[in-house]
Swiss-Prot record:
Belongs to the pseudouridine-5'-phosphate glycosidase family. Catalyzes the reversible cleavage of pseudouridine 5'-phosphate (PsiMP) to ribose 5-phosphate and uracil. Functions biologically in the cleavage direction, as part of a pseudouridine degradation pathway. Its EC number is 4.2.1.70. InterPro entries: Indigdn_synthA-like, PsuG. Homotrimer. The active site is at E22 (proton donor), K156 (nucleophile). Mn(2+) binds at D135. The gene is psuG. This is Pseudouridine-5'-phosphate glycosidase. Binds 1 Mn(2+) ion per subunit. It comes from Coprothermobacter proteolyticus (strain ATCC 35245 / DSM 5265 / OCM 4 / BT). Keywords: Glycosidase, Hydrolase, Lyase, Manganese, Metal-binding. GO terms for biological process: nucleobase catabolic process.
Amino acid sequence: MLQIAPHVKEAIETLKPVVALESTIITHGMPYPANLHTALEVEQVIKEAGAVPATIGVINGIIKVGLSEEEITYLSQAKDLHKISLKDLSVAAAKKLSGGTTVSATMFASYKAGIQVFATGGIGGVHRDARESFDVSTDLEALGSIPITVVCAGAKAILDLPATLEYLETKGVLVVGYKTDEFPAFYYGRSGLKLEHSVTTPGELAQIIRERDALEINKAILVGNPPPEEMALEKGKVEQLIEAALQQAKVNNIKGKDVTPFLLDYLAKNSKGETLETNIALVKNNAYVGSLIAKALMAAKI
C-alpha cells in the first residue's frame, strides 16, 4: 500500500515542486546520529530552496511518501530494519516489514505518487567483482524503466564506474552532467569518464525532461552532479581505501545486499570520517540541485 503524506499530496496536486528522498541512507548508509541529522538537514535544504521534501520509506508494510520527523527518527535508530529494493516491496507489504527504500524502490514509489524529481547520494551499479559475482544493482534496471529524474553524484565510488556507465548506455538511460562533462565519481568529482551531454542550468534540464515526457520515453534521466569541490577527496587515497575494503569484505565473506553498507562503513572508519563528511555534503548538494530542477519543471506548468 502506498500512503502519501497530506502535505506532499497537496503539493503534487497544486503543482508545487517536490523532491523525493530515499531512506537506505538513513537505515544502512550512515551511523546514528549522523543519519538522523543528515536526513533532517537534507529536508531543510529542500525547503529553503523553495521545494517540498518527500522522504520515502516503509513502515509496517506501508510505503510512506513523505515521512514525518518521528518516522525518520524511528528509521534512524530501530534495529533489524530491512534494505528494501524494488523486488522486496511486495514482500515488505505482505509481511508488514519496516526498512529503508533503495534507489530503485524510491524511484517506483516516487513515480506512483506523481513526483518527478528524486535526489540521492549515489546510485548502485556494477560491482567491481561482477565477472565472478554477477552483482549488478537493481537501480540500473529501474533507471531503464521508470521515467523520473534522478539527481546523484554518479555511482558510488566502490563500484566499477566504466561498466556502470556502459550498462546505463545499454539500457538507454540518458546521463546528463550538471555543470560537468564527466561522470561524477561520488567521493571524488572527476572520474575521467566523459559524458556525451551536459547542461549548465536547471532550465535546460527541465526542457530535456519535458521533451522526454512528450516523446513518451519511459526511462529515467540521470543527472550527474559532482560533490562540492571543497569536500571532494583525493582519488588515490580513496582508491587505496576501497581496495582494502574490498579485500576485507572477501575475508569476511560479505555478499549481496550487505556489501555496500559494509564497504561504506569501512571507508568511513578508516578515513577518520572523511568519506562520511563528503557523503553528507554531496547528498545536500544533490538535494539543492534537485530542488532547482523541480522548480524549473513546475514553473512551466503554472
